[in-house]
Amino acid sequence: MSALIDKINETLAVIKKKTNKNYEVGIILGTGLGGLVKDISIEHEIDYSDLPHFPLSTVESHQGKLIFGMIGGKNVVAMQGRFHFYEGYTMQQITYPVRVMKFLGVKTLLVSNACGGMNPIYQRGDIMLMIDHINLLGDNPLIGKNEDEFGPRFPDMSEPYNLELIKLAEQVALENKVKVQKGVYVAVPGPNLETKAEYRFLRAIGADVVGMSTIPENIVANHMGMRVLGLSIITDEC
């Protein structure tokens, strides 16, 4: 058994003291979006500091809790606060919670982020459904020995965000008269914001919005066979 699986089992042992349920949906709440946890019927919550091998979020707006509860009759586990490359964590540390979620039964992962809008038709406050991404973080969580129990050595990333979930999200948005965009997210390391020349470059290579997260978690979720839906909240017009 690998050291990573040993670590996951140690984390699961703490979680199982609180709950033995199977959680089919995982949620990662991004910067400024932790308040969405109010829509979850909370049954249990565990501070990251109480979970073995979990990193600790250093971002002020991230609460640093793993939330267990229900939404719409579904058992969900939600991260109230995520980890970023610019905080000094490795890609493996950033994505460790996604590995744990898979062992809790998660088959569908909803990831959210706050981002800068570069597409000129996007406005502050718009929601963008992520249809693809560009990884400019300069690293990848799958580098190193592959764990065959998790997934293949060379996972297919031709559809990183599940088309069925995107269509479902569009339908829900239409029914609720919520305007949504669809586009490509590019991740950069940060923590500094981009220069004007960098914004022009990112637009030229096909990105609609820019942020500093989400892609590592998406790669690991795809590696483990999860369906992923990505939501970007445009907080600035770049």
Go through the PLM ranges and name each one.
Residues 2-157:
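Metabolite-binding pocket within alpha/beta catalytic cores that recognizes anionic/polar moieties
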Residues 14, 18, 164, 168-179:
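Generic non-transmembrane alpha-helical segments
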Residues 102-105, 203, 222:
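Non-catalytic positions within long, well-ordered alpha-helices that form the structural scaffold/packing
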Residues 107-108, 208, 227:
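Short acidic/polar active-site loop segments enriched in Thr and Asp
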Residues 171-208:
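Active-site/ligand-binding-proximal alpha/beta "capping" segment
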Residues 212-238:
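Zn-dependent metallopeptidase/amidohydrolase metal-coordination segment
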